[in-house]
Design a protein with these regions (language model features):
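Short beta-strand to alpha-helix junction loop
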Residues: 2-5, 30-39, 78-97, 107, ...
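Active-site substrate-recognition segment that forms the wall
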Residues: 9, 19-22, 132-133, 141-273, ...
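A short, glycine/Asx- and small/polar-enriched loop/turn
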Residues: 35-38, 66-74, 116-124, 257-261, ...
């Protein structure tokens, strides 16, 4: 949570430095029933502890003054005015360009099938389908396959690092619907995540989703009729005027959910120089700038830069 807060604080300045689109649009977490007041208050208290600035608990009247298209079936909401949105593709490309300018070389389209470290030395050898590489540091940021990469190196997978592919299906709506909300609209979270959100994009569309489906197929990025119907149904709980006729495309992606229910970012005690950066699901994008700095410090413990 603290990584999220600090990463969010830095995003505006980073967008100017690296030239990607960022908007400070704020967010609302909706409470539909008065009986959920304690849960909303707990979310507010957690935000205060983690240093989220200017949080407010709003009445339904205050919410509707800000967002008139929000459901009337509302008991209140948590407002975070510091929240923002980015273009995730633009951010990723900007970071990659910056890395390239600083000497990073990209090697695409290769599957890692073996990693070994010298018994008496500090050098790793990494075999892929195309090449063999040598390195003093290996950073395991392999997403849904991070547990498999860890097992190649250590021979085991810690329980907290076991990865489940959690599919999220989204619908992208036409720009004619972009006016329906200004803020990013969440629902009170459950153990499966933040529920279905409704948010404007930096390009003026409306994005609705995601689902949270734990699946066995770590390549299962297909959409399903049931999943997309659920996106509209649950999204309409927040914004009743959502219409499937305004959907211009749908897609899905996989979050790398760790069984430890948290990011798994640490150096491996058994194999010095091997660093796991795993289980990075939401809010991983917001945390990315701070995660990068934290991992750089782990690298510096083993490498003189």
């Amino acid at each position: 949570a603290k990584l999220n807060v600090e990463g969010s604080r830095r995003m505006a300045a980073l967008s100017k430095e690296l030239d990607f689109h960022y908007e400070n649009n704020g967010s609302l977490v909706l409470m539909f029933e008065e009986e959920d007041r304690d849960s909303l208050q707990a979310l507010y208290d957690k935000g205060q502890v983690n240093g989220v600035e200017d949080l407010q608990i709003l009445t339904s009247k205050q919410v509707h003054e800000m967002e008139p298209h929000i459901t009337e079936q509302l008991a209140g909401a948590l407002y975070a005015p510091t929240a923002g949105i980015v273009c995730p593709f633009g951010l990723t490309i900007a970071l990659a360009e910056n890395a390239y300018d600083n000497g990073v070389r990209f090697e695409f389209g290769q599957e890692v099938f073996k990693i070994e470290k010298e018994e008496l030395g500090n050098l790793f050898t990494i075999w892929t389908t195309d090449h063999k590489y040598e390195a003093r540091i290996v950073i395991n940021a392999a997403g849904v396959y991070a547990d498999a990469i860890h097992e190649m190196v250590t021979g085991e997978i810690p329980d907290a690092l076991k990865i489940v592919a959690r599919r999220g299906q989204y619908m992208l709506m036409d720009k004619t619907e972009g006016h329906l909300v200004k803020s990013t609209i969440f629902q009170l979270p459950t153990k499966m995540g933040k529920g279905i959100l409704v948010t404007p994009t930096v390009h003026g569309n409306l994005l609705v989703g995601p689902t949270a489906e734990d699946i066995d197929d770590k390549e299962g990025t297909n959409t399903t009729r049931e999943g997309l119907e659920g996106v509209i149904e649950k999204g309409s709980m927040s914004v009743p005027t959502l219409s499937p006729r305004k959907v211009i495309t749908s897609f899905s992606g996989l979050r790398a959910h760790s069984m430890g229910n948290d990011f798994y970012i640490k150096g491996c005690d058994e194999v010095p120089g091997f660093i796991d950066v795993a289980g990075i699901e939401s809010p991983g994008l917001s945390c990315a700038p701070v995660i990068g700095e934290y991992v750089a410090e782990l690298v510096k413990e083993h490498l003189t830069l």
